[in-house]
Amino acid sequence: MTVTVLFELRIKPDAVPAARDLMHRPLEVTRAFDGNLGIEVLVDADDEAHWMMYQLWDTVEHDEAYRSFRAGEGKVTELPPLLAAPPVKTRYVTSDI
């Protein structure tokens, strides 16, 4: 069953250009990761430092494997200093409603 993940980032306002430059490569890796069905980065129209990453995964297990990868060998170590707050991840399962 597919799952949708919303991953919210609050970037330090003065770090937005650096975050934009940084995220190109990690997003390429995410898009190529096994089980990823798509990812879009949404930027708040009123606050360019507020980003929402909309991710679609084939299964919960694919999402979990990706999270493990990002916590280990795929960690984006340059990102935390650019953040104004810790990221917030919310996972949704697709229902039959």
Regions flagged by a language model, labelled:
Residues 4-9, 38-67:
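Short, well-ordered beta-strand segments in beta-rich or mixed alpha/beta enzyme
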Residues 93-97:
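Short, low-order "capping/linker" segments at domain edges
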